[in-house]
Amino acid sequence: MGAGPGLLIQPDWLVADARNPPRAGWGVRVVNGLIDTVGPNSDLSDRYPDDEAIPAPGRILMPGFVNSHVHMYGVLAHGIPTGSAPTGFWPFLEDFWWPQVEDRLDHEMITAATDWVCTEMLLSGTTTFLDILEAPASLPEALLAEKDIVDRRGLRGVLSFEATERSSPESGQMGLLENLAMIDACRDGGLTSGIMYTH
């Protein structure tokens, strides 16, 4: 039990983990940003009468969702006309995705997409994600542009650049360096981290 004032979050239902059933009338006590106590809402109110309480009738409290594979920049392709229907996956990549989306991305477009998708994730309950960016014309510091938005939104994000020689051998090397720079930029901790990603 933590000392000091806490915050009681009191929903109608608590889903704590997959091993236990949902619990009606249960909530949590938060102290210094961490869950300190889990139990029936009435018990929490009795045990911690001086804590601020947030009643949440009609609500469910549960851990955030995890999106383990996302390409946030892909949201920018919504509504771009293809001219004709792709005849397969490779024609889709070669005739549409690479020239119309990935090869045109710059920092401004990347940050707009990141902001948009982070907002959608938060609104849908996703709090943790792994993003793979592929935008050869945006190097260097494209991942740092993403990181700035993710940090401001308060999500836990793992950011990576798809290092590939699709555009050129030099682009592949720059992608590796981009990942290394992100890994180094996140060494001090925080909600954002980087990983090495190749394709």
Please give the residue ranges for each predicted region.
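N-terminal metal-binding scaffold of metallo-dependent hydrolase/deaminase domains
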Residues: 1-47, 60-61
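Divalent metal-coordination and catalytic microenvironments
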Residues: 12, 28, 33, 58, ...
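Histidine-centered catalytic micro-motifs
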Residues: 63-75
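Active-site gating loops and adjacent loop-to-helix segments of metal-dependent hydrolytic enzymes
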Residues: 76-110, 167-168
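A short, small-residue-rich loop immediately preceding and capping a beta-strand
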Residues: 105-109, 128-136
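Short, acidic/polar
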Residues: 107-120, 174-179
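Short acidic/polar active-site loop segments enriched in Thr and Asp
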Residues: 127-128, 156
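Metal-coordinating catalytic core of metallo-dependent amide/deamination hydrolases
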Residues: 138-199
